[in-house]
Regions:
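Active-site rim beta-loop-alpha module in soluble metabolic enzymes
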Residues: 296-357
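A short glycine/serine-rich beta->alpha loop
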Residues: 2-4, 135-137, 170-179, 209-218, ...
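Stable alpha-helical structural segments in soluble proteins, enriched in small hydrophobic residues
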Residues: 22-26, 185, 192, 222, ...
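Short hydrophobic alpha-helical membrane-entry/anchor segments
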Residues: 2-11, 21-42
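Gly/Ser-rich oxyanion-binding loop with an adjacent helix/lid
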Residues: 199-284
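ATP-binding N-lobe of GHMP and related small-molecule kinases
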Residues: 54-60, 65-68, 75-78, 86-215, ...
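Short, well-ordered amphipathic alpha-helical segments that serve as non-catalytic structural scaffolds
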Residues: 183-193, 326, 365-368, 413-414
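Glycine-rich, charge-dense phosphate/pyrophosphate-binding loop(s)
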Residues: 11, 50-52, 60, 65, ...
């Protein structure tokens, strides 16, 4: 078995274990809410809707488009309109799990049915668009290529129609970014126009980067998603009509795995797998008050180099070790059991190899962070950044005295460890962000477009 095939097999197994843990937590919460777990229970005349009552699985229902390839059709007549059940052809309103208030089911069915047949005629192609995208921290220990977290650290990208191609950048890693069409921002734009069935126009790109470049914080995934979103807007598509699932399929197809692009798009903590047909993600509840303390070395870490040190095969014992830890990790997040995070982030598939051959400071820094009070610490993405997760005495950093600020104590311990190993870098403290990519400015603005659908149902 090739190294690539083996990696995909392990990532699939780990992703399945993590997804299983999420479903188990969801089932427990549903039982608590429903008592006898009866989907047809009523409360004050309303039929219960257990699945979306649970915050772990609450997502933007109208933006979830599941059937591929109809999802990418530019002609509304070609779209199936099916959402939420993959290849089954069902709509969410046909599912036994979706129970609307009994007096309004027909109206909701009509809303869902019409949502995906909105004509896109007279939508203005845009001249310029600005998109904000968050950093991400992937793998999170055992979740190799399938678990990622959105970090409250944002880059801003402006893409405009122009007479000549140009890429300019300022901020983090500006001098290291490719200035040709190999830049992932351009790759994302090309993919968006191709999916829209339109030729790529001449564009200029300006990046205000606050995400450290090639440091294990998802700079490439952020660029891919920003490019896709910008491209769809410039091509004259309204994003709600395409849905965030369309963005996921395009972005993960470029990246090759969903652990970074999913949190860039959706925010929060995301699980992602490929089910054999398409990319699928689920959100995991983020514990309140969770802080992210990251040590970012000054040197660049290449993902290709970090993957190159991994062995082509793994033992059954190591695979079982990671599967168990991934399930434990997801359960700890979903139940706010921060004490279990330390065991949940343990890994045998990539961190030991990378720590031994690339990042000698990795395990000493993890130990220093945890000894200082961190819930856990791990290698962020392919490195070289080390990420620690902490929770203060009250969960609100503004209500704490400095001696209660666990994140400050952990930061000082990580800085001292870096000094001991002679590694220069910087320390940032931030938090998990619940939202993903967003359009912040469009020229001409969306409000100048014509209304293409209206109903009073």
């Amino acid at each position: 078995m090739s190294q690539q095939d083996n990696g995909k097999l392990i990532a699939t197994a780990v992703g399945a274990a993590a997804a299983g843990a999420t479903l188990a937590v969801m089932a427990m919460k549903m039982m608590d809410k429903q008592g006898n777990n009866n989907n047809n229970a009523t409360t004050n005349g309303y039929r219960r809707y257990p699945y979306y009552d649970d915050p772990i699985h609450r997502r933007d229902l109208p933006n979830v488009i599941m059937n591929d390839p109809s999802m990418l059709m530019t002609d509304p007549s070609e779209r199936s309109g099916s959402i939420g059940h993959g290849q089954t052809g069902m709509t969410r309103s046909d599912s036994d799990n979706l129970l609307f208030p009994h007096n309004h089911e027909e109206k909701m069915r009509r809303r869902i049915a019409t949502r995906y047949t909105i004509e896109e005629e007279n939508i203005l192609p845009r001249d310029s668009v600005t998109v904000r995208v968050p950093a991400t921290s992937a793998n999170v220990g055992p979740g190799y290529d399938c678990i990622g977290i959105a970090v409250d650290l944002w880059s801003e990208v402006t893409v405009s129609r122009a007479e000549t191609f140009e890429i300019t950048a300022e901020g983090e890693g500006a001098e290291s970014m490719p200035k040709d069409d190999s830049n992932y921002l351009v790759v994302g734009c090309k993919a968006a126009f191709e999916a829209a069935g339109k030729p790529l126009p001449t564009l200029k790109y300006h990046v205000v980067s606050r995400i450290p470049y090639a440091r294990g914080l998802g700079s490439s995934s952020a660029a891919i998603v920003a490019g896709i979103v910008a491209g769809l807007v410039l091509a004259g598509h309204r994003l709600p009509c395409w849905g965030s699932e369309a963005l996921l399929q395009i972005a993960a197809g470029i990246e090759g795995h969903p652990d970074n692009v999913a949190p860039v798009i959706y925010g929060g903590i995301q699980l992602g797998i490929h089910n054999g047909t398409r990319w699928v993600t689920e959100r995991v509840q983020s514990p309140p008050g969770l802080q992210m303390v990251m040590f970012i070395p000054d040197f660049v870490g290449k993902t290709s180099d970090a993957r190159g040190v991994l062995p082509p095969t793994v033992t059954r014992a190591d695979a079982a070790f990671n599967i168990g830890r991934a399930a434990f990790l997801v359960h700890a997040f979903a139940t706010n059991n921060l004490d279990n995070l330390r065991w949940g982030v343990q890994d045998k598939l990539h961190q030991p190899q990378r720590g031994d051959k690339l990042y000698k400071y990795l395990y000493p820094m993890i130990e220093a962070a945890e000894n200082a009070g961190a819930c856990c610490a791990y290698l962020s993405g392919a490195g070289p950044t080390v990420m620690a997760l902490t929770s203060g005495a009250s969960g609100d950093i503004f209500a704490q005295r400095e001696k209660e600020r666990t994140d400050i104590l952990v930061a000082k311990a990580m800085i001292q460890c870096a000094k001991d190993f002679g590694v220069d870098g910087k320390l940032l403290v931030t938090n998990v962000v619940s939202e993903g990519a967003r359009v912040v400015k469009v020229v001409p603005p969306f409000s100048t477009g014509e209304i293409t659908y209206r109903d009073n149902i």
